[in-house]
Swiss-Prot record:
Pfam families the record matches: CAP
UniProt cross-references to Gene3D superfamilies, sorted A to Z: CAP
Chief subcellular location: secreted
Protein name, UniProt field: Scoloptoxin SSD43
The keyword Metal-binding is annotated on this UniProt entry: no
Function of the molecule: Shows trypsin inhibiting activity. The protein is highly thermally stable, since its incubation in boiling water during 10 minutes does not reduce its activity.
SMART domains to which the protein is assigned, alphabetical: SCP (SM00198)
PTM text: Contains 3 disulfide bonds.
CDD domains: CAP_euk
Record has Secreted as a keyword: yes
Length: 211
């Protein structure tokens, strides 16, 4: 798939940004503070699950701490700037280090879109039967893929993008994850004492997660 090389046009009179897809944006991109917040929120939720603090969900022995990846973030930002609530193609999620990344997306008008997006993905935990953690498989009638990706143990990198449409005020948040999860018949994470199966030891910043 060929992507259009886009440019950012700043319209001084209205402070709009226009990308190659024709979407006019009143806001776009994440600054360092926003990146740190969404990364921290992901890791705190992973830590919550790993340490057995999520009701009905077992502890995890091998869940990794997530780290920010600029290539994932650049792809996610391009996805957000389409201002379309639609998953991107494999080509649009491809990275040099990890191959094709996983993707979660959000569109809405809440005042805190970054936190809202992650919270909505995580809330799918209420429909997760713990039995599926040992051998993941899709089951009809429940949307759980965003949560499963959020807590997939072997995922170690994340990058997110953000854009707000000037036309309707809709905010778009896309996060890309690598290595991606949701592999059928693979474990989401290994049950056991938190961080007991870490290959490189336990995270000092997020005890219960692996380095």
């Amino acid at each position: 798939m060929n992507f259009v090389i886009y440019g950012v046009i700043v319209v001084l009179t209205s402070q709009l940004y226009v990308d190659g897809w024709g979407c006019q944006m009143s806001e776009r991109g994440l600054d360092k503070k926003m990146k740190n917040k969404i990364l921290k929120h992901h890791n705190e939720l992973r830590q919550k699950v790993a340490n057995g603090q999520e009701r009905g969900q077992p502890t995890a022995s091998n869940m990794k701490q997530l780290r920010w990846n600029d290539e994932l973030a650049a792809n996610a930002q391009r996805a957000a700037e389409r201002c379309i609530f639609q998953h991107t193609s494999d080509e649009g999620r491809k990275t040099t280090k990890y191959g094709v990344a996983g993707e979660s997306m959000y569109a809405g008008t809440f005042s805190n879109p970054l936190k809202t997006a992650v919270d909505m993905w995580y809330e799918e935990v209420r429909d997760v039967n713990p039995s599926i953690l040992d051998s993941y498989d899709y089951y009809p009638g429940a949307v759980i893929g965003h949560y499963i990706q959020l807590v997939w143990a072997e995922t170690e990198a994340i990058g997110c993008g953000y854009a707000k449409s000037a036309a309707d005020g809709e905010s778009y948040v896309f996060c890309h994850y690598a290595p991606h999860g949701l592999f059928p018949q693979q474990s989401v994470y290994k049950r056991g004492s938190p961080a007991s199966a870490c290959k490189k030891g336990q995270s000092s910043r997020y005890p219960g997660l692996c380095k």
